């Protein structure tokens, strides 16, 4: 986020006129504490989402306890894996906070997030479709578009959970070797 608190509030009021569902991390993140976000949340006309850079369940619990966000966004690649995202989503659910796992980057992270969404305790996030929300980067990215064979496919705005073993994808070992350090 790059907004000041005042500008974030102005933007949120503007976006509300277009029926936006939430606003994600509008202010700079200076630490896992997300200073100022609990104050911002109290003034927001839209649900406030954040927590994509959380590195532990303890950091997530602190934000949930502070009510810093309406929607917590743990990322499996940063917070300790799929099991930690499920744990954090259970903590959130117990506190009345929604959980939309964050997902940005490579095929492997996308596959892990899709599998995790199938595990979260309550898929009814209050969206009109009652389906989990998957954040899916569409920018050009060789790590997302070639690292795995059998990519996660989007059809009519939906993703099916792969049924193959593991994450449901096969890693392209040649590409991994190409980028190995």
Where is each model-derived feature located?
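Alpha/beta enzyme core
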Residues: 5-22
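Active-site mouth loops of central-metabolism enzymes
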Residues: 1-6, 49
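Shared catalytic-loop signature of beta/alpha-barrel
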Residues: 13, 19, 27-49, 53-158
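C-terminal extensions of enzymes
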Residues: 141-181
């Amino acid at each position: 986020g790059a907004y000041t608190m005042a500008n974030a509030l102005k933007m949120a009021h503007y976006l509300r006129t277009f029926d936006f569902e939430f606003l994600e991390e509008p202010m700079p993140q200076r630490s896992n504490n997300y200073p100022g976000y609990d104050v911002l949340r109290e003034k927001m006309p839209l649900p406030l989402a954040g927590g994509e850079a959380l590195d532990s369940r303890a950091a997530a619990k602190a934000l949930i306890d502070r009510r810093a966000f309406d929607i917590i966004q743990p990322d499996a690649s940063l917070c300790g894996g799929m099991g930690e995202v499920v744990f954090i989503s259970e903590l959130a659910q117990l506190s009345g906070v929604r959980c939309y796992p964050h997902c940005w980057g490579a095929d492997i992270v996308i596959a892990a997030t899709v599998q995790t969404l199938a595990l979260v305790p309550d898929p009814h996030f209050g969206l009109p479709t009652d389906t989990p929300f998957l954040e899916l980067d569409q920018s050009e990215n060789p790590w997302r578009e070639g690292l795995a064979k059998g990519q996660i496919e989007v059809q009519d705005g939906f993703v099916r959970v792969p049924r193959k073993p593991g994450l449901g994808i096969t890693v392209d070992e040649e590409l991994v070797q190409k980028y190995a350090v």
